[in-house]
Amino acid sequence: MVLVDSSIWIEAFRRQGDVHVKLALKGLLDEYEAAWCSVVKLEVLSGARKEERKALTTRFSIIPFLPVTEADYDWSVDAAWKLRERGHVVKSTDLLIAAVAQRADIRVYAQDKHFEIMRDVLGIGLYQPGYNGMYNPGTE
């Protein structure tokens, strides 16, 4: 299972979006390995065009959902402190997404550089697609 960040969903749904991202997301969806959480849903759906909203809501309804818990908020606060001590400031929403993935022991697929910082400082796992976007079951 891979928690797909909003940066990937948004890029994949752009008309001129990166074809590699589109293929990689398709690979995760085809293998039933894509997951989402409420933070991702908020980020994606709040920026969706009116004509896309129903299709996106339907798509999210059939993908595995990982809830955000109080423990995820606590983890995010601790993570923010660790990052700040090393000179990094990361958005609260990205911290929550990382917390959900960390608790579920799964990787995050993101284009956002903050996740690379969190990988380096906090040890979160990041997903790297396989050849031509095929699902890569291995670790980072």
Where are these regions (language model features)?
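General small-molecule cofactor/ligand-binding pocket signal
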Residues: 35, 66, 127
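Acidic, PIN/NYN-like endoribonuclease modules and their adjacent C-terminal/linker elements
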Residues: 1, 98, 102-140
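Structured helix-beta-strand junction loops
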Residues: 31-32, 62-63, 86, 104, ...
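Generic structural signal for small/hydrophobic residues in well-ordered secondary structure
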Residues: 5-6, 44, 76, 101
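Active-site neighborhoods of divalent-metal-dependent phosphate/nucleic-acid chemistry enzymes
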Residues: 65-109
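A secondary-structure boundary/capping signal
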Residues: 5-6, 40, 111
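Short, well-structured N-terminal submotif of metal-dependent ribonuclease cores
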Residues: 1-36, 45-58, 134-139
